[in-house]
């Protein structure tokens, strides 16, 4: 192929590089496979993984493939299509593809980011995505600049369609945020069968758990030092607007 290797690079231990790959000031080792039109610049790629298509790994990113920690022992870390990774750590068996753009993130285990998803941390706060969490569609997950403004997606949580997650938000078991919903922390904790979709808006210091569905143009907003706790089963929709914890049985 026409692979190019420029600036000081370290390549060792069963690395495969071919096609039109460009490796610039990077360390690649231990079984990594890099092909097609990939660019790896000022970053490291270690262990058995596959980076191909038009993927780019840039700006002090660290790719560390580790298999065998999950039920899918054989699944390898892959970055492909037009996925771009900047200033991020990608570990274990992660899958990044489509037009995903990832900046200042820590993504691990079997998490997936794909389609046109945007993951955007900053130099103060990374976005953290782990377990089997997925971000896809045109969804955006964005860290804030204040302390702890770190979005965290865990377990089987999913952010999809045109949803926005911003700031100190933690999504746990069986959480799906989709539609044009906006969730701005915080801190916000969503856990145990929570669905947020439509044009719903969740903002402030809020705990939503146990089978709660929020859709339509509903808003749950905690002002100042208030904390709102919603525990299901509950359906909140239409133009509903909640600004304090409902009395038991009132919803």
Regions from the PLM with identified roles:
Residues 3, 9, 15, 21, ...:
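Residues at the loop-to-beta-strand transition
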Residues 250-251:
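Extracellular/surface-exposed low-complexity segments
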